[in-house]
Amino acid sequence: MTDPRLVTPERRGDDLGDAALRPQHLSEFVGQQQARANLQIFIDAARKRKEALDHVLFVGPPGLGKTTLAQIVARELGVGFRATSGPVIAKAGDLAALLTNLEERDVLFIDEIHRLSPAVEEVLYPAMEDFQLDLIIGEGPAARSVKIDLSKFTLVGATTRAGLLTNPLRDRFGIPVRLNFYTIEELESIVKRGARVLGTGITADGANEIARRARGTPRIAGRLLRRVRDFASAADADAIDRKIADHALGALEVDAAGLDAMDRRYLSTIALNYGGGPVGVETMAAALSEPRDAIEDIIEPYLIQCGYLQRTPRGRLLTASAFRHLGLAEPARDPGQFGLFGGEEDGD
């Protein structure tokens, strides 16, 4: 995206202030009830046996708490925590430096693990399975293989795109955990806790208003809370209520469904310029002056989740709900526009 959006689930520079809002223990973590319960059992068992926890893979959309849970896992285990990301580990030597500095049962967190290079993955396999590094030292005839024993550690990987993980890497994670979008009630609890941490008063309806527009994502809820708090402070309000939250979020162009100006521009372009669709993703990328991957990975997922957009074999198609949200009349359309099977398209 050309501009950072307030409702993007991706991490932004101003999200650094979120650290204070993050829960420190599983008991404080809101949502993901089954995943939390299972993690607590696995952590308790590892502590009782005084063993390293099996490798953990967190899968889910951005902003749902994968990094926070990784930090909590290390804290609950009472071990060290090291964090990095797939793109940062450029070569096998970078990974070797990280692994050889880990203490017994430490947690190594790799965000965006699907972006590891094949060469780095090859080094990671024996490290995960046998806690050994197999490295080639030197080049040509003088090259030799060296085995280095590692401390037993726990690798925690996080990915938003599980389909890009290779099968050998995926199969080495003993504890796969899928994170789902949060309910409004769960987000209300997160907003209320965030307000307490920030020392800001908030009413139940004020928390609900922020939660409803947070797109099922705690990161967005925290970001909206901080911005609404600014409006409340400027108005000398004692607490954030629904009226203040509605005014602030309206001024920030986040509507009642959590859509921002870019979302509405996307929907309006299809509705007004292409009769509601179908229209290909390349056409939409050109119309909005945005790269195709931004359309597919950032804009469209939430619109599909809300039921405003369909991906059909012939292109993107607006639903009746989208026209109602835009306040437009739905045009009469040929049922054939939905394609033979109504499945997804490649977006060409």
UniProtKB/Swiss-Prot annotation:
Pfam families: AAA_lid_4, RuvB_C, RuvB_N. The keyword Transcription regulation does not apply. DNA binds at residues 292, 311, 316. GO terms for biological process: DNA recombination; DNA repair. GO terms for molecular function: ATP binding; ATP hydrolysis activity; four-way junction DNA binding; four-way junction helicase activity. Mg(2+) binds at residue 67. Residues 256-348 are annotated as: Head domain (RuvB-H). It catalyses: ATP + H2O = ADP + phosphate + H(+). Residues 183-253 are annotated as: Small ATPAse domain (RuvB-S). One of its GO terms (cellular component) is cytoplasm. It comes from the Bacteria. It is found in: Cytoplasm. Its EC number is 3.6.4.-. ATP binds at residues 21-22, 63, 66-68, 129-131, 172, 182, 219. Transmembrane segments: none annotated. Residues 2-182 are annotated as: Large ATPase domain (RuvB-L). InterPro entries: AAA+_ATPase, AAA_lid_4, DNA_helicase_Holl-junc_RuvB, P-loop_NTPase, RuvB-like_N, RuvB_C, WH-like_DNA-bd_sf, WH_DNA-bd_sf. Belongs to the RuvB family. The RuvA-RuvB-RuvC complex processes Holliday junction (HJ) DNA during genetic recombination and DNA repair, while the RuvA-RuvB complex plays an important role in the rescue of blocked DNA replication forks via replication fork reversal (RFR). RuvA specifically binds to HJ cruciform DNA, conferring on it an open structure. The RuvB hexamer acts as an ATP-dependent pump, pulling dsDNA into and through the RuvAB complex. RuvB forms 2 homohexamers on either side of HJ DNA bound by 1 or 2 RuvA tetramers; 4 subunits per hexamer contact DNA at a time. Has 3 domains, the large (RuvB-L) and small ATPase (RuvB-S) domains and the C-terminal head (RuvB-H) domain. The head domain binds DNA, while the ATPase domains jointly bind ATP, ADP or are empty depending on the state of the subunit in the translocation cycle. During a single DNA translocation step the structure of each domain remains the same, but their relative positions change. Homohexamer. Forms an RuvA(8)-RuvB(12)-Holliday junction (HJ) complex. HJ DNA is sandwiched between 2 RuvA tetramers; dsDNA enters through RuvA and exits via RuvB. An RuvB hexamer assembles on each DNA strand where it exits the tetramer. Each RuvB hexamer is contacted by two RuvA subunits (via domain III) on 2 adjacent RuvB subunits; this complex drives branch migration. In the full resolvosome a probable DNA-RuvA(4)-RuvB(12)-RuvC(2) complex forms which resolves the HJ. This is Holliday junction branch migration complex subunit RuvB. It comes from Rhodopseudomonas palustris (strain BisB5).
